From Swiss-Prot:
One of its GO terms (molecular function) is acyl-[acyl-carrier-protein]-UDP-N-acetylglucosamine O-acyltransferase activity. Involved in the biosynthesis of lipid A, a phosphorylated glycolipid that anchors the lipopolysaccharide to the outer membrane of the cell. SUPFAM superfamilies: Trimeric LpxA-like enzymes (SSF51161). GO terms for biological process: lipid A biosynthetic process. Belongs to the transferase hexapeptide repeat family. LpxA subfamily. Its EC number is 2.3.1.129. Pfam families: Acetyltransf_11, Hexapep. Pathway: Glycolipid biosynthesis; lipid IV(A) biosynthesis; lipid IV(A) from (3R)-3-hydroxytetradecanoyl-[acyl-carrier-protein] and UDP-N-acetyl-alpha-D-glucosamine: step 1/6. This is Acyl-[acyl-carrier-protein]--UDP-N-acetylglucosamine O-acyltransferase. It comes from Vibrio parahaemolyticus serotype O3:K6 (strain RIMD 2210633). Transmembrane segments: none annotated.
Length: 262
């Protein structure tokens, strides 16, 4: 169903059955399949391909040559009806690729709200991107990667499958991340190593000085004290009782499957 206020260019192809919301615009030479749903106010520019069971929220901007909901590149994929779910107010720039999920994992690829996906970024199957993230030009998020809220993955960086980039963390350009990046940490290099906290990001997002000092102390316990992670865990657990941000920082020590960058 196409809402009466939607504007579909005559050179676009929108298959019967697609749900196109109010005030959506679709540019020329764009192709949208029958199982796609696009929320109100979203702008889909020219030469975009949106396929499969893809649901896109409100007020997104999708630039030319983006491909969303295409079959993933996992060799186990057998044509199952897996999905892509995208939230609201995202900017998806030229030639970004967002692949559908696999039944071996969550069967869906998820992008939250208010994200910037820069030119030619690749979002592989079963990735989960939170809110307010920045994925740089030509960055690659491998299958099953999680990028938490307010994190940044800069240009030409690659995140290994199954890794997590924690909230407010920042991965510098041209980096290769093969283990989890804890929340708030600044990472850089091939293979990426920690370079302190993302202090600029913390200040921009309203973290107060006492909270930042607590995070700095927690960082030193993990990375500079010479203690094992098992020795550090009870210290951070005690700090986390007073500082919720420290809990978020230390939670990954319990959940990581690939280990954290060191």
């Amino acid at each position: 169903m196409i809402h009466e206020t939607a504007k579909i260019h005559p050179a676009a192809v929108v298959e019967e059955g697609a749900k196109i919301g109010a005030n959506v615009t679709v540019g020329p030479f764009t192709y949208i399949t029958s199982t796609v749903e696009i929320g109100e106010g979203t702008e889909v520019m020219s030469h975009v391909v949106i396929k499969g069971h893809t649901k896109i929220g409100k007020d997104n901007r999708i630039f030319p040559h983006a491909v969303i909901g295409e079959e993933n590149q996992d060799k186990k994929y057998g044509g199952e009806d897996t999905t892509v779910v995208i939230g609201d107010r995202n900017v998806i720039r030229e030639a970004v690729q967002v692949h559908r999920g696999t039944v071996q994992d969550k069967a869906t690829t998820v992008i939250g709200d208010d994200n910037l996906l820069c030119v030619n970024a690749h979002i592989a199957h079963d990735v989960v991107v939170g809110n307010h993230t920045h994925i740089g030009n030509n960055a690659i998020l491998g299958g099953h990667v999680t990028v938490e809220d307010h994190a940044g993955v800069m240009a030409l960086s690659a995140i290994h499958p199954f890794c997590t980039v924690g909230a407010y963390a920042y991965v510098g350009g041209c980096s290769a991340v093969v283990q989890d990046v804890p929340a708030y940490v600044l990472a850089q290099g091939n293979h990426a190593t920690p370079f302190g906290l993302n202090l600029v990001g913390l200040k921009r997002n309203g973290f107060e000085k006492p909270e930042i000092r607590a995070l700095q102390k927690a960082y030193k316990e993990i990375y500079r004290s010479g203690k094992t992670l098992e020795e550090v865990k009870p210290i951070l657990a005690e700090m986390a009782q007073e500082w919720p941000a420290v809990k978020r920082f230390s939670d990954i020590l319990e959940t990581t499957e690939r280990g954290i960058i060191r």
